[in-house]
Amino acid sequence: MDRIKEIRKAIDSIDTDLLKLLNDRAQLAIELGEIKNELRLAIYDPSREREIIKMMLSKNDGPLDDQAVVGLFQRIIDESRRVEKFSVSSDKNITTENKQRESK
């Protein structure tokens, strides 16, 4: 039972780290969206998305299989694209939007 608690504590710590890293990535996506908007570049760049997936697959040593890696990174990319679009379509804060959604 103690080992289960230890493992869960380690997982919780990793989850906290992942959340911080994902929010850091989202912040960079917001900045990228603003720059793309200034340069009149499209938010959606399928070749860049394919490049990210390919790079992550090449770095995958498991135990996650490639299908899991593709699914996870596709979701991360989708959310990054969403915050990029949001950053140029509104002056609202992403965090404010999330809090409003949670209160409903």
Q: Can you describe what each PLM-predicted range is?
A:
Residues 1-104:
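Domain-level signature for soluble enzymes in the chorismate/prephenate branch of the shikimate pathway
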